[in-house]
């Protein structure tokens, strides 16, 4: 398994809405994530800084990257665009984090 972590932002006035939209996520999005090898996906909110910290374990970079081209992912990004900063293609603006420590 490959462990990934990344950070995104959420609009200051959208914390509750962001959480509401994720609980639960669309069943078809959950199915796509799982079928593309995503496991143990979690997102945490830093309310003071409007930051989202996400972790996920993936089976391969190729399968993880393929999620972005699915119809359901494209619809999800469009659905979330009003609650978080996004790129021109509607994907959330994010930065991948480098792992510096792991205790198993």
Swiss-Prot record:
Question: Could you tell me the superkingdom of the organism this chain comes from?
Answer: Bacteria
Kindly state which reaction or reactions the protein catalyses. alpha-L-rhamnose = beta-L-rhamnose
Q: Name one Pfam family in it.
A: rhaM
> EC class of this enzyme?
isomerase
| Biological-process GO terms, alphabetical | rhamnose catabolic process
Q: What InterPro entries would the database entry show?
A: Dimeric_a/b-barrel (IPR011008), L-rhamnose_mutarotase (IPR013448), Rham/fucose_mutarotase (IPR008000)
Spell out the catalytic residues. 22 (proton donor)
Known EC number(s)? 5.1.3.32
Q: In which pathway does it act?
A: Carbohydrate metabolism; L-rhamnose metabolism
Mention one GO molecular function: L-rhamnose mutarotase activity
Q: Name one GO cellular component term.
A: cytoplasm
Q: In which residues is substrate bound?
A: 18, 41, 76-77
Compartmental location: Cytoplasm
Q: Which family does it belong to?
A: Belongs to the rhamnose mutarotase family.
Describe its assembly: Homodimer.
What is the purpose of this protein? Involved in the anomeric conversion of L-rhamnose.
Q: Which NCBIfam families match?
A: YiiL_rotase
What is the protein name given in its UniProt record?
L-rhamnose mutarotase
Organism the protein comes from: Salmonella dublin (strain CT_02021853)
Which gene name does the record give?
rhaM
């Amino acid at each position: 398994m490959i462990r990934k972590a990344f950070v995104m932002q959420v609009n200051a006035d959208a914390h509750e809405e962001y959480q509401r939209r994720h609980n639960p996520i669309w069943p078809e999005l959950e199915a796509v994530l799982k079928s593309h090898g995503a496991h143990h996906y979690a997102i945490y909110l830093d309310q003071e800084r409007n930051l989202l910290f996400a972790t996920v374990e993936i089976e391969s970079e190729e399968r993880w990257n393929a999620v972005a081209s699915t119809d359901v992912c494209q619809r999800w990004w469009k659905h979330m665009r009003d609650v978080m900063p996004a790129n021109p293609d509607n994907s959330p603006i994010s930065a991948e984090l480098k792992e510096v420590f792991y205790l198993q």
